[in-house]
Design a protein with these regions (language model features):
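Catalytic glycan-binding domains that act on GlcNAc-containing polysaccharides
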Residues: 1-169
């Protein structure tokens, strides 16, 4: 879902910011991931699809595990695009109880557009695989969908009176 939006599946894509490859990973981010996560990829070969996807997936897992995203899918997607620091700031400035309101109030116009497009891409892939979409059902119900494959409930409701706590939903 990210690779479609980031590069339209072009392994040689390069952004104005210097991000490269299918998942549009910047060389500095790749170097950080080697230090932080101990992966064995080569930051000098970001146009190699296998190498690039390893870095991109590892970065998704990294931002998934940050306290600022809490593993919540819209926040993880936003963090992949905007970086982790803005997400922490937005969490403290905006009501966190409604995930759709979070998406619509993202101050960066690029990221505000990016999140629903990546979600749409993800849902299309789910549908092609004949899978139900827990994340889509969660958003319709006003719940925060969690990053796929995480242990525990597939979605949570954030208590607006205590934004750091979440109530699980299966």
């Amino acid at each position: 879902a990210h690779a479609l939006q980031e590069s339209n599946f072009r392994p040689d894509a390069v952004s104005p910011a210097g991000a490269r490859g299918l998942m549009q990973v910047r060389p500095g981010t790749a170097g950080d991931l080697i230090r932080w996560r101990g992966i064995s990829g080569d930051p000098g070969r970001l146009t190699d699809p296998v190498n690039n996807i390893e870095f991109g997936q590892t970065y998704l897992e990294y931002v998934r595990d940050l306290p600022s995203t809490g593993g919540l899918l819209p926040r993880v997607i936003a963090s992949y695009n905007a970086g982790p620091a803005p997400i922490a700031e937005w969490n403290s400035r905006f009501d966190q109880s409604d995930p759709l309101l979070f998406i619509e109030t993202i101050p960066y116009w690029e990221t505000r557009g990016y999140v629903p497009i990546v979600l749409r891409n993800y849902w299309i892939y789910e549908q092609l695989g004949a899978d139900e979409s827990p994340s889509r059902r969660a958003l319709v119900a006003g719940l925060w969908p969690r990053f796929p494959g995480m242990a525990g409930p597939t979605a949570v409701r954030i208590d607006p009176r205590r934004p750091q706590t979440a109530m699980g939903r299966d």
